[in-house]
Regions:
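Post-Walker A helix-loop "phosphate-sensing" segment adjacent to the P-loop in P-loop NTPases
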Residues: 82-92
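Catalytic cysteine-centered active loop of the rhodanese-like fold, especially the PTP/DSP P-loop
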Residues: 59-82
């Protein structure tokens, strides 16, 4: 999913040292509101795919987010998507923030 339509905190000097995991960027994105509307639409699409994958017995679905630098908007979006899928479906989620060299595992909820 292309996040470049969402207002970019990276164009402001004070947000450049941060990522979408840091509170200043999170606050910027959430106060602006564009990210919430964007993700609501993405959740709807992905939820339908996850349900269909589960019904069909598939075990791997890759969801990717991108933006200009891979630091703010896409990181925020990927983090929130991973949390959303894990809490809604209880499945294992492997999250990779490639540009930050961060990996996080959300184990399946039994």
């Amino acid at each position: 999913f292309d996040c470049r339509a969402v207002n970019n905190p990276g164009k402001y000097e004070r947000y450049k040292p941060f990522t979408g995991l840091d509170e200043p960027v999170i606050t910027f994105l959430e106060e602006d509101g564009e990210i919430t509307r964007f993700l609501d639409h993405v959740y709807e699409i992905v939820d339908a795919s996850v349900k269909r994958y589960m019904d069909r017995g598939f075990t791997n679905l890759m969801i990717c987010f991108g933006c200009t630098g891979g630091q703010h908007r896409s990181v925020y979006s990927a983090q929130h998507m991973a949390e959303h899928i894990h809490s809604k479906f209880g499945v294992r989620v492997d999250l990779v923030h490639r540009e930050q060299n961060i990996e996080q595992l959300f184990n399946a909820i039994l």
